[in-house]
Amino acid sequence: MANNKLAIIGGSGLYDVEDFKNRELLDLDTPWGKPSDQILKTNYNSKEVYFLPRHGKGHFISPSNINFRANIDALKQLGVTDIVSVSAVGSLKEDLPPGKFVIIDQFIDRTFTRNKTFFDDEIVAHVSMAHPTSSGLMDACEEAIRKAEINYQKGGTYVVMEGPQFSTLAESNLYRSWSADVIGMTNMPEAKLAREAEIRYASCLLYT
């Protein structure tokens, strides 16, 4: 556990973490192209931490155009073992008000234009997605959120739509009938690729 390396992938509205000191910006290349932006390397509580803005600083990359494979591959190159993904989402339930956090444990992937695997050329592999998030990493996120006295929910299902348009009313009602909790555009195929790269993954979402 002492050799764990954490990366935070920031979503809409989270493009930097100013509290991180001793900052170094890393410009990486991958076989899949460039990641969304430079990766911030820093130390927090004497631990090495990395930060990557999913949409690029200034939010110039739309969800469908994010190079998810390059993002995950770049973090793998850095030896990252754990990813905490932070995203803004919409609520599908009346009892989940704006400002509440949820630590998601399941996904429904409704995207259809994105490259979703590292294994589509020369090598074929099939990984289990039954449990796409790490229970241990979820527990760590819960502890941090609880210490900050933030309203949260642990567990839930995230519908990931293609975007950039929002869902129709009929689509939202369909997702509610599936018992989904939230809807957004960014955690797929990110979670699948992290799984293929053998990086533990947890998703902390903010209802907006």
Where are these regions (language model features)?
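Active-site/ligand-binding-proximal alpha/beta "capping" segment
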Residues: 150-181
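A C-terminal functional module that forms or caps the active site or interfaces directly
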Residues: 171-174, 180-203
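Metabolite-binding pocket within alpha/beta catalytic cores that recognizes anionic/polar moieties
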Residues: 2-129
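Generic non-transmembrane alpha-helical segments
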Residues: 136, 140-151
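Conserved small/polar residues in nucleotide/adenosyl-binding loops
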Residues: 207-208
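Polyanion-binding loop/helix "lid" in catalytic or ligand-binding cores
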Residues: 122-133, 162, 169
